[in-house]
Amino acid sequence: MRLNSLSPAEGAKHSAKRLGRGIGSGLGKTGGRGHKGQKSRTGGGVRRGFEGGQMPLYRRLPKFGFTSLKSLHVAEIRLNDLAKVDGNEVTLEALKAANIITKNILSVKVILAGKIERALVIKGLRVTKGAKAAIEAVGGSIEE
């Protein structure tokens, strides 16, 4: 078997519709577009969300909330997420390597949620009071 001898399975690919190639093709003359109207013209068609002149849904509904720009580079992580980090030292780079946070995160805060099973050394991360107590209770430490 060679690359040049490969072909798709029988019936796996449909032949393309050849529009406007005579009435015998079944798709001649109007080419499946019907007669007249905006959608039959070249470049015709309405924009996404257009409802025929009626006030569209995206304008009938009120604006709601906003996206904080701070959330794009600040993250909160739970105590049980720390278990996914290899080794016993948790830094910003270690969290990125373990796919717990995305690469654009610049600052992380550890919050008291979930359980921590092993002693870890937290470096360069912010920690809540409750999370700090839980980390120190299992023999871990926090370094600035």
UniProtKB/Swiss-Prot annotation:
Keyword Ribonucleoprotein: yes
PROSITE patterns: RIBOSOMAL_L15 (PS00475)
Pfam families attached to this UniProt entry: Ribosomal_L27A
Top-level taxonomic group: Bacteria
Biological processes, Gene Ontology terms: translation
Gly residues bias spans: 21-31
Function: Binds to the 23S rRNA.
UniProt subunit comment: Part of the 50S ribosomal subunit.
Protein name: Large ribosomal subunit protein uL15
